[in-house]
């Protein structure tokens, strides 16, 4: 074969099977560069096959529910139960039956760049998205578990059309007679995973803005969780207006600074 490596690379990018005549022809080319291209092409196909299989697996609950006649299946998830500061945020997402974007998974398993890309895709393709944001004051009043349920219900109530079936990550919500709570649902249901991405990106962006308002706690990086820098901030600065006073390290910092007055 007399074609350059660059030309072969471009042609292989259009090939989808080892049975393709051009791929077969390349296998006879002994140049190391060509053999490396064949190897990388096979790896690309393997990755694509895994993503396609993962998509089918992630849609199995939705596929079954669509077959049962449900039309508007909402996935619900939350983020921010554990942080010492900021709100708890829930999202509810209704995806179309033909939604086929690969790479949707539990937001915690995706890097920030990937989450941001998928956030935009989900916003563009979803039938409806609802978001519930419950701030630190309510969390302190009712506890984080109840605040999370309020956030989820708020997100669901924002959906239009209203869902006729609800898939929830872990927490039984009793929002509808037609609902299913799934342990680690954000790794099992594409609707819940999509909701986890919407909730995560929404809250992260809020915390990045809070970092500008309340510097010294590293909110832009820890998102309000009790990291070393955050705890150091509590020790040296004290609490800020978005801290959860019912959470132990915050409560201790507040008492400490009050004792110094």
From Swiss-Prot:
Enzyme class: hydrolase
Pfam families recorded: RNase_HII
PROSITE patterns recorded: RNASE_H_2
Highest taxon listed in the record's lineage: Bacteria
GO function term, MF aspect, one: manganese ion binding
Cofactor: binding details: Manganese or magnesium. Binds 1 divalent metal ion per monomer in the absence of substrate. May bind a second metal ion after substrate binding.
Enzyme Commission no: 3.1.26.4
Alphabetically ordered keywords of this record: Cytoplasm, Endonuclease, Hydrolase, Manganese, Metal-binding, Nuclease
Compartment annotation: Cytoplasm
Domain RNase H type-2: 71-259
Cofactor: Mn(2+); Mg(2+)
InterPro entries per UniProt: RNase_HII (IPR022898), RNase_HII/HIII (IPR001352), RNase_HII/HIII_dom (IPR024567), RNaseH-like_sf (IPR012337), RNaseH_sf (IPR036397)
Major location (coarse): cytoplasm
GO biological process, one term: DNA replication, removal of RNA primer
Annotated catalysed reactions: Endonucleolytic cleavage to 5'-phosphomonoester
Gene Ontology cellular component terms for the protein in this record: cytoplasm; ribonuclease H2 complex
Annotated binding of a divalent metal cation, by residue: 77-78, 169
Functional summary from the UniProt entry: Endonuclease that specifically degrades the RNA of RNA-DNA hybrids.
NCBIfam families: PRK00015.1-1 (NF000594), PRK00015.1-3 (NF000595)
HAMAP family according to UniProt: RNase_HII_B
UniProt similarity note: Belongs to the RNase HII family.
Protein name listed in UniProt: Ribonuclease HII
Natural source organism: Listeria innocua serovar 6a (strain ATCC BAA-680 / CLIP 11262)
């Amino acid at each position: 074969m007399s074609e350059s490596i660059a030309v072969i690379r471009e042609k292989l990018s259009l090939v989808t099977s080892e049975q393709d005549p051009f791929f077969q022809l390349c296998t006879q080319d002994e140049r190391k560069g060509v053999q490396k291209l064949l190897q990388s092409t096979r790896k690309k196909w393997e990755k694509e096959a895994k993503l396609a299989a993962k998509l089918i697996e992630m849609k199995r609950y939705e596929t079954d529910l669509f077959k049962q006649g449900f039309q508007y299946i909402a996935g619900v998830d939350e983020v921010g139960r554990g942080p010492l500061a900021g709100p708890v945020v829930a999202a509810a997402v209704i995806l179309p039956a033909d939604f086929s974007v690969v790479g949707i998974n539990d937001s915690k398993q995706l890097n920030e760049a990937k989450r941001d890309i998928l956030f935009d895709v989900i916003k563009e393709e979803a039938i409806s998205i609802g978001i519930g944001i419950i701030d630190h004051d309510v969390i302190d009043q009712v506890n984080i578990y109840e605040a999370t349920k309020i956030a989820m219900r708020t997100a669901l109530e924002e959906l239009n059309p209203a869902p006729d079936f609800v898939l929830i990550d872990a927490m039984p919500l009793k929002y509808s007679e037609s609902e299913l709570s799934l342990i680690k649902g954000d790794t099992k249901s594409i609707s819940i995973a999509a909701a986890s991405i919407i909730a995560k990106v929404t809250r992260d962006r809020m915390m990045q803005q809070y970092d500008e308002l309340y510097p010294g706690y590293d909110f832009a990086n820890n998102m309000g969780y009790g990291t070393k820098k955050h705890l150091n901030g509590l020790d040296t600065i004290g609490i800020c207006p978005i801290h959860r006073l019912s959470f132990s390290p915050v409560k201790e910092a507040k008492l400490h600074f009050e004792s110094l007055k």
